[in-house]
Amino acid sequence: MGCSGCSGGCGSSCGGCGSRCGGCSSSCCVPVCCCKPVCCCVPACSCSSCGKGGCGSSCGGSKGGCGSCGGSKGGCGSCGGCGSSCCKPVCCCVPACSCSSCGKGGCGSCGGSKGGCGSCGGSKGGCGSCGGCGSGCGSSCCVPVCCCVPACSCSSCGKGGCGSCGCSQSSCCVPVCCQRKI
């Protein structure tokens, strides 16, 4: 089903998901594992289920209190986008590129907070395990935002080994022993 004709003001702005779009539900366009949804208040599926034969029964749908779909929520603006054939949350701050880009010429503006995620800590937006870059990451390593509470301050990172310490830098939680230069 195409994305056109959605109710609730979505209309032609639904994002061109084409045949992979899940249609409309509760006045909101509900993509199912299609890239770049515009008018969906919630992610189509969690990133942990991307590219693994479907998103499961909990995918899609709309969540109460979204209000007008397609905009920003929580001050994250246009964070999200497409990765691994999975619709990442539109309004959750996530890295702009994958960890596969780490240490390969730099990630540019990857990582960091895009509009503010609030306080870091816990798991948000399908971070799963924190980091994911492996050991020995350089300063341009892509890391998730708002995932993992640091165990100690930045002042102790990279000084004689991280030990069990994490590192908080620019409101972004860095995984343990990422060896980011301070």
Curated annotation (Swiss-Prot):
<dbReference type="InterPro" id="IPR006081">
    <property type="entry name" value="Alpha-defensin_C"/>
</dbReference>
<dbReference type="GO" id="GO:0006952">
    <property type="term" value="P:defense response"/>
</dbReference>
<comment type="function">
    <text>The keratin products of mammalian epidermal derivatives such as wool and hair consist of microfibrils embedded in a rigid matrix of other proteins. The matrix proteins include the high-sulfur and high-tyrosine keratins, having molecular weights of 6-20 kDa, whereas the microfibrils contain the larger, low-sulfur keratins (40-56 kDa).</text>
</comment>
<dbReference type="GO" id="GO:0005576">
    <property type="term" value="C:extracellular region"/>
</dbReference>
<keyword id="KW-0416">Keratin</keyword>
<comment type="similarity">
    <text>Belongs to the KRTAP type 5 family.</text>
</comment>
<dbReference type="GO" id="GO:0005882">
    <property type="term" value="C:intermediate filament"/>
</dbReference>
<protein>
    <recommendedName>
        <fullName>Keratin, ultra high-sulfur matrix protein</fullName>
    </recommendedName>
</protein>
<keyword id="KW-0677">Repeat</keyword>
